Amino acid sequence: MCRIAGALRTLLPLLAALLQASVEASGEIALCKTGFPEDVYSAVLSKDVHEGQPLLNVKFSNCNGKRKVQYESSEPADFKVDEDGMVYAVRSFPLSSEHAKFLIYAQDKETQEKWQVAVKLSLKPTLTEESVKESAEVEEIVFPRQFSKHSGHLQRQKRDWVIPPINLPENSRGPFPQELVRIRSDRDKNLSLRYSVTGPGADQPPTGIFIINPISGQLSVTKPLDREQIARFHLRAHAVDINGNQVENPIDIVINVIDMNDNRPEFLHQVWNGTVPEGSKPGTYVMTVTAIDADDPNALNGMLRYRIVSQAPSTPSPNMFTINNETGDIITVAAGLDREKVQQYTLIIQATDMEGNPTYGLSNTATAVITVTDVNDNPPEFTAMTFYGEVPENRVDIIVANLTVTDKDQPHTPAWNAVYRISGGDPTGRFAIQTDPNSNDGLVTVVKPIDFETNRMFVLTVAAENQVPLAKGIQHPPQSTATVSVTVIDVNENPYFAPNPKIIRQEEGLHAGTMLTTFTAQDPDRYMQQNIRYTKLSDPANWLKIDPVNGQITTIAVLDRESPNVKNNIYNATFLASDNGIPPMSGTGTLQIYLLDINDNAPQVLPQEAETCETPDPNSINITALDYDIDPNAGPFAFDLPLSPVTIKRNWTITRLNGDFAQLNLKIKFLEAGIYEVPIIITDSGNPPKSNISILRVKVCQCDSNGDCTDVDRIVGAGLGTGAIIAILLCIIILLILVLMFVVWMKRRDKERQAKQLLIDPEDDVRDNILKYDEEGGGEEDQDYDLSQLQQPDTVEPDAIKPVGIRRMDERPIHAEPQYPVRSAAPHPGDIGDFINEGLKAADNDPTAPPYDSLLVFDYEGSGSTAGSLSSLNSSSSGGEQDYDYLNDWGPRFKKLADMYGGGDD
């Protein structure tokens, strides 16, 4: 009985919640009021409130679902409100009277409209072990035990019982924590036990949803549950003693969240697009719309039903479509869909849960746009029964007439595009009709020339169709056929020769003035009185003339079949015929003269030059004949030698091989090398035959054993012509002139060099040499030198020191050079001598100085040097007074030096 009572207590909240949801849904449909549905929200809490602990959930009624509401707390330091209305603790604090009441505000983000509701928190009474023992109204779950078969005492059973799941409705309004069940062990009479639960929702994320009193074992839920987030919780209950030792095996507790109708259906698309052909029969499928509901699909809360709320436009019937209330398939239910009248329908589709219950179910809407597609239910119709046009004769690819049609189908579709055909009046296919892709007009075009003299008018029967056949039951009206009357305009046409070309046969050799034929043209314009005149357009050999009035053709020169203007025995001449119409027209005709051959060309020998040996053997000359005539005025030919001069037949003999070839051989045993002209008589087979004496130029030469001319004979025989000799002489003369000019230039250069030479011996002229000497430091070996040549600066007269400027050393001065006195020798230059002696002594005593006493090698200065070696150079102490007069003979470049050291009293 206790368990039954507990089960009833569990079901009562569920039934109450269902009843409350039904009432709320009914009230919402009847009259929805935006704001908080409750005046005061209350919750029962423990004394200690922890940071982040969910306290309660406040609901806000948003009737149209479009408001965006923001929540605020009047005590923001202690409480905060999430977007879903869940109230959390901002910090940890003990619950007291000052926290018992506060306000929650809801404000519309767009309109700034504001609502408020009061929240009341009450302190849950503290449970003691005595109060727990006295509490017997809450359903208990006892850890299972059973009797032993042997002892009859209570023992643990080997297998746990299966605890029935706890059903808890979602969105419960509390107060929280809400007691669910009490877990108890029958060993609590002897031991002090502590109870705990583990699993998702307790100590695993999301934590804190379920809590248990460790002393009483009371299991509670701390906040409203949401089945759409978690539909089932699986917890495990544990019982331990005060030392933490396990007293009972853990038992499984399953908590099922009972679904509430708290979610409206949502369409996958807010706007659905579909098409249906016009003229569709009832029952034609159009499209499918789909909505989903987050509630339990196996319960009424998630079972959706569809219906059409409205249709726009409502023609021809307000109920043109219907929808399957379970699948969302939209089909046609009425006939009369006509795209030309209504091109698009807009349906408002509603999806309602609770199997479409309008009282308790939640609804949502979407839009279905149905486009009526075109079919070929309107044939093209001509705007007129007869169309007119005209065309000049002999003109093609011109538009004669425009055929216009109307079609009510959708433009630029196969059901609208027109196709024209000619059904009568054009047996020879001279006309065609093309469709203008933009205007859909038919363009009647002439494709073959029309002769006015043959047909002056055409009456065409044309029909218009579409690219696709008409829909079933639609027939072509009479307006789909029309007549086109085409008038042909006469124009001046070109005269024409008949036949063209005209062929005549004539023998060559006709004399000038011979009338060959009459070549006339015809005027196709029979209804115009016009005259034709003739002129010659092309006559390559200028053999013909034509009468401008009657067209008679006469020769003005002898016709020759062998002329280069004759190809394959045919001579072509072109003539022009012109009328006097407006505008004047002309035509050309070709006269082909087939020339018959006569024997008017004598044969000639081929080749005209040949070679043979001085002896008859082993060579012979093969010859043939060239005749510009053709059979029978050509071969076979007869070959013979003339009687004079007598040396021809004495030296040569000719043998006829066949009708075209003969062989020429030496008759005598030896003929001196040279060039001989042998006349040969050749006669053709014409009637009468024609003969000719042709000269064969034969070169007789010395031959080798093979019968070939030797190279010596070829070179001698070749010789040099006058032009070659003149060219060789000119080359020799030019070469001699170049050599002579080179010799003259060399002579002139030598003279210039001699004019520039100095008066001194060339061997002593070393002015142009820049001599580099090796290192000569360390002092001279020859220290016996005359220091009298060194002059102190104070011995020079002040007047002699004058600035003369800077000039080139090879420049000849144009004014008198200053004269300097001859330096007097200083007999005892003590200062310079002491300086040199001190330096010499220091060098001799320096142990780090290099051994300059060794043999020193100097560069060779050439044979032009006055001193053959350095040892032959004279110093100031080697002799008496030095003679520097020879410096005056060295030219202007040494004049400065000669003036300084030359003899002179001053």
Curated annotation (Swiss-Prot):
Residues 863-880 have a biased composition (Low complexity). SUPFAM superfamilies: Cadherin-like (SSF49313). Residues 1-25 form the signal peptide. Residues 160-267, 268-382, 383-497, 498-603, 604-714 form the Cadherin domain. The keyword NAD does not apply. Changing Y676C: In ACOGS; decreased function in cell-cell adhesion. GO terms for molecular function: alpha-catenin binding; beta-catenin binding; cadherin binding; calcium ion binding; gamma-catenin binding; identical protein binding; protein kinase binding; protein phosphatase binding. It comes from the Eukaryota. Residues 863-884 are annotated as: Disordered. InterPro entries: Cadherin, Cadherin-like_dom, Cadherin-like_sf, Cadherin_CS, Cadherin_pro_dom, Cadherin_Y-type_LIR, Catenin-bd_sf. The modification Phosphoserine is found at S96, S135. Residues 26-159 form a propeptide. Changing D407N: In ARVD14; uncertain significance. Ca(2+) 2 binds at E170, E228, D259, M260, D262, D295. It is found in: Cell membrane; Cell membrane, Sarcolemma; Cell junction; Cell surface. The chain crosses the membrane at residues 725-745. One of its GO terms (cellular component) is plasma membrane raft. The keyword Zinc does not apply. Ca(2+) 1 binds at E170, D226, E228, D262. Cleaved by MMP24. Ectodomain cleavage leads to the generation of a soluble 90 kDa N-terminal soluble fragment and a 45 kDa membrane-bound C-terminal fragment 1 (CTF1), which is further cleaved by gamma-secretase into a 35 kDa. Cleavage in neural stem cells by MMP24 affects CDH2-mediated anchorage of neural stem cells to ependymocytes in the adult subependymal zone, leading to modulate neural stem cell quiescence. May be phosphorylated by OBSCN. Residues 160-724 are extracellular. Keywords: Calcium, Cardiomyopathy, Cell adhesion, Cell junction, Cell membrane, Cleavage on pair of basic residues, Disease variant, Glycoprotein, Intellectual disability, Membrane, Metal-binding, Phosphoprotein, Repeat, Signal, Transmembrane, Transmembrane helix. It is a single-pass type I membrane protein. Homodimer (via extracellular region). Can also form heterodimers with other cadherins (via extracellular region). Dimerization occurs in trans, i.e. with a cadherin chain from another cell. Interacts with CDCP1. Interacts with PCDH8; this complex may also include TAOK2. The interaction with PCDH8 may lead to internalization through TAOK2/p38 MAPK pathway. Identified in a complex containing FGFR4, NCAM1, CDH2, PLCG1, FRS2, SRC, SHC1, GAP43 and CTTN. May interact with OBSCN (via protein kinase domain 2). Interacts with FBXO45. Calcium-dependent cell adhesion protein; preferentially mediates homotypic cell-cell adhesion by dimerization with a CDH2 chain from another cell. Cadherins may thus contribute to the sorting of heterogeneous cell types. Acts as a regulator of neural stem cells quiescence by mediating anchorage of neural stem cells to ependymocytes in the adult subependymal zone: upon cleavage by MMP24, CDH2-mediated anchorage is affected, leading to modulate neural stem cell quiescence. This is Cadherin-2. The gene is CDH2.
